[in-house]
UniProtKB/Swiss-Prot annotation:
Heterodimer of an alpha and a beta chain. HAMAP family: IHF_alpha. PROSITE patterns: HISTONE_LIKE. It comes from Stutzerimonas stutzeri (strain A1501). It holds the Pfam family Bac_DNA_binding. Belongs to the bacterial histone-like protein family. GO terms for cellular component: cytosol. One of its GO terms (molecular function) is structural constituent of chromatin. Keywords: DNA recombination, DNA-binding, Transcription, Transcription regulation, Translation regulation. GO terms for biological process: DNA recombination; positive regulation of metabolic process; regulation of DNA-templated transcription; regulation of translation. The keyword Mitochondrion does not apply. Residues 53-72 are annotated as: Disordered. This protein is one of the two subunits of integration host factor, a specific DNA-binding protein that functions in genetic recombination as well as in transcriptional and translational control. This is Integration host factor subunit alpha.
Length: 100
């Protein structure tokens, strides 16, 4: 199983919508840049029928160096999380054949 790349997304836009290759690539880049900028400005990104990107603050916590076993602090940080929407979950479950 492979991974979908931005180049493949641009190629699909080229094939399906008739955009030229440069326009298709720019559209994909602009889409992801909008998501990045929203997250940089502490905004939630809601993509209807797909899911939400959120920022979450993680507190400092104790960790351990796996080589030495020494306890070291893991610093507080902000992370991006993705929560899939119900429609996306349903499609993935139906495709995977694991729908309850």
């Amino acid at each position: 199983m492979g991974a979908l790349t931005k180049a493949e997304m641009a190629e699909r836009l080229y094939e399906e919508l008739g955009l030229n290759k440069r326009e298709a690539k720019e559209l994909v880049e602009l889409f992801f840049e909008e998501i990045r900028q929203a997250l940089e400005h502490n905004e939630q990104v809601k993509l209807s029928g797909f899911g939400n990107f959120d920022l979450r603050d993680k507190r400092q916590r104790p960790g351990r160096n796996p080589k030495t076993g020494e306890e070291i602090p893991i610093t507080a940080r902000r992370v991006v999380t993705f929560r899939p929407g119900q429609k996306l979950k349903a499609r993935v479950e139906a495709y995977a054949g694991t729908k309850p």
